[in-house]
Amino acid sequence: LGTGIIPNNYMSNFDPHAGRALSVVPGKRVPTSMAPMLVLQDEKPVYALGLPGGLRIFPSALQAIVNLIDHDMTLQQAVEAPRIWTQGQEVELEDGLAAQKPGLEALGHQVKLVPHIGGGMNAISFGETMTGAACWRADGTVLALGGGLARPGVRFWPDKAPEDEEDAAAG
């Protein structure tokens, strides 16, 4: 039996009107807002990125991708760039876009300045080398581990050699 408890603010993901795909009904599962992104070029990965942030994940990730592709930003610049968000009501702007507030208000938008939109984005660019980036919105940091990809004979448990496994299988 369910408890009736909805985690975080996920009730906003449901439609309050009956008879629709996301209408509130007993036993309905909470939709999620996960959006790990891969950007491909010629079927090869160019960028991978993701972040926490509920409903603000999708537009935040897309803004970073637009910044990378259309505005030629570096990976670090793209994940740290100021963000904008709306769900049809007021427009939220991070402080870095505060200069846009009067223009948006002149167009009839209600604008709210906020310290951050979405969570701390992390990203990787793939090329001759891999480059990582983490933004200021969270305590994330870039960490790289060397050693190359796993090869035949490489095991997670150093005390168990491949020969031990073969002997056990044959025994």
Give residue spans per PLM region.
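Proteins synthesized as precursors that undergo proteolytic processing into mature forms
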Residues: 1-117, 158-160, 167-171
